């Protein structure tokens, strides 16, 4: 598989008018293979298993929010970077998940070929399926290099997507609290 991938990169370099045997490009096919192997490593992991490994009984019934989880992914249409942040909240229903598992889950989904809308839904669904909370809220804000580097070339444009479940849809106060918290000042100093 690696050899086939590297040969494809060599062919691509040749097609665009480059010499894959010149000094700066000799190891490029191998480097690109390793980069893509890492950038798509999310296919080798199950986010629901990661979440399920750290479930704890809790009487907490207030919002748990982890915001500003930075990520990068690859657009499935152009294989160009998506760079952004995710805000994830849920209202427990007898169980909480270990905090480190939320960014791990985000990374698993981000390290797949993606569209932002799908990734937002996948994160919400995984939390909903594994911990069965009273509600889930996910907001993803990202820059898409397929928009900035080609096509319309709109540098610094951002896309925001959301997925709301349970009480985040049904209860306007919960929804307001969530959006208020994720929009409060971002810098925290301890």
Curated annotation (Swiss-Prot):
- Which Pfam family is one of this chain's hits? GTP_cyclohydroI
GO biological process annotation, one example? tetrahydrofolate biosynthetic process
Query: EC number(s) in its UniProt entry?
Result: 3.5.4.16
Q: What class of enzyme is it?
A: hydrolase
The pathway to which it is assigned is: Cofactor biosynthesis; 7,8-dihydroneopterin triphosphate biosynthesis; 7,8-dihydroneopterin triphosphate from GTP: step 1/1
Q: What keyword terms does UniProt attach to this protein?
A: GTP-binding, Hydrolase, Metal-binding, Nucleotide-binding, One-carbon metabolism, Zinc
GO MF term list: GTP binding; GTP cyclohydrolase I activity; zinc ion binding
Record Gene3D superfamilies: 1.10.286.10, 3.30.1130.10
* One cellular component term from this protein's GO annotations in UniProt: cytoplasm
Positions of Zn(2+) binding: 75, 78, 146
The reactions it catalyses are:
GTP + H2O = 7,8-dihydroneopterin 3'-triphosphate + formate + H(+)
Subunit composition and interactions: Homomer.
The family note in this entry says: Belongs to the GTP cyclohydrolase I family.
According to UniProt, the name of this protein is GTP cyclohydrolase 1
Organism, as annotated = Campylobacter concisus (strain 13826)
Q: What is the lineage of its organism?
A: Bacteria, Pseudomonadati, Campylobacterota, Epsilonproteobacteria, Campylobacterales
Q: Which gene encodes it?
A: folE
């Amino acid at each position: 598989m690696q050899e086939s991938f590297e040969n494809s990169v060599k062919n691509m370099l040749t097609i665009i008018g480059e010499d894959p045997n010149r000094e700066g490009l000799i190891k490029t096919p191998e480097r690109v293979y390793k980069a893509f192997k890492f950038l798509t490593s999310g296919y080798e992991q199950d986010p629901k298993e990661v979440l399920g490994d750290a479930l704890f009984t809790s009487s907490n019934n207030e919002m748990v929010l982890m915001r500003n989880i930075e990520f990068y992914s690859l657009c499935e249409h152009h294989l160009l970077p998506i760079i952004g942040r995710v805000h994830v909240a849920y209202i427990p229903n007898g169980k909480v998940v270990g905090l480190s598992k939320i960014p791990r889950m985000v990374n698993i989904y981000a390290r797949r070929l993606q569209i932002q809308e799908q990734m937002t839904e996948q994160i919400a669904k995984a939390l909903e399926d594994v911990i069965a909370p009273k509600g889930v809220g996910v907001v993803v804000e990202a820059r898409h290099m397929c928009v900035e580097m080609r096509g319309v070339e709109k540098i610094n444009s951002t896309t925001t997507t959301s997925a709301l479940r349970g009480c985040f849809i049904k209860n306007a106060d919960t929804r307001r609290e969530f959006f208020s918290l994720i929009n409060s000042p971002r810098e925290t100093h301890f």
